[in-house]
Amino acid sequence: MCIRDSAETPADAKRALDFGAEGIGLFRIEHMFYGEGSEEPLFHLQEMIMANNQDERKTALDSLFPFMKNDIKETLRAMQGLPVTIRLMDPPLHEFIPHDAKRQKKLAKALNINAEELERRSDALKESNPMMGHRGVRLGITHPEITEMQARAILEAAAELSSENVKTFPEIMIPLTGMETEYNHQEKIVRDVAVS
């Protein structure tokens, strides 16, 4: 039997190892957007969420990538070759949209849109049942570039550590999969990234 802990940050992973955990059973990738030091990656995530087209989304994902890769890399490093199950982003996107006027203004300026357009885009994200809405695997299907970026961050982090002779054992969890076709779609993206 293997007993694992959960972790939300590299520091959590180190603490889990100190406690004797035999791996991380759930590393929620989106928790890098909460807490200390999260302001810049959260801002890039917000840019990605509010992007109006593929080019805007790709630019935001490219800005977000180094933050995500670093968090994953340091978590894998902390676990010293023990398994780390990394769950791809799961929460509904509207949870990450700023609610205070100062942050809304900053985001609108970065996107080169006015406050009304930001509000329109934000309203379009609201759902009547967020638990069953546009999140998890469904987000990855409608925007495969989001899954691709996360998979690339995980795999590059592991490869960089391997080149430093640090053993890693990353595992990828695809959240909220309800049908085989959903799983197959996301699995193909991850495997394509792995061989590229």
Protein language model regions, located:
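Conserved alpha/beta-domain cores
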Residues: 4-196
